[in-house]
Amino acid sequence: MIKIRLKRYGKKNRPTYRIVLIESQKPRDSKTIEELGHYDPLLKQANFKFDEIMKRVGQGARLTSRVRYILKQFS
């Protein structure tokens, strides 16, 4: 199953996340299929390709609860 979820990067105690399309059984920081945006929780900023995310959801990708929350908050 393909999921749209967060991939952590950044520094210790200073996380930033990429919103990525990835196989659900792979580890969080493994190779992704596609990068769809990014999210900075400390600055409360998010940039993402909303049209591309909706296209992938239409093709059967599932959103994690955290990504769904980010999309609702910043759309």
UniProtKB/Swiss-Prot annotation:
Q: Which family does it belong to?
A: Belongs to the bacterial ribosomal protein bS16 family.
Q: What is the recorded name of this protein?
A: Small ribosomal subunit protein bS16c
**A GO-annotated cellular component:** chloroplast
Q: Which GO terms describe its biological process?
A: mitochondrial translation
Q: Does Ribonucleoprotein appear among the keywords?
A: yes
User: What GO MF annotations does this protein's record show?
Assistant: structural constituent of ribosome
Keywords, A to Z, come to: Chloroplast, Plastid, Ribonucleoprotein, Ribosomal protein
Q: Where is the signal peptide?
A: none
Q: Where in the cell is it found?
A: Plastid, Chloroplast
Highest taxon above the source species:
Eukaryota
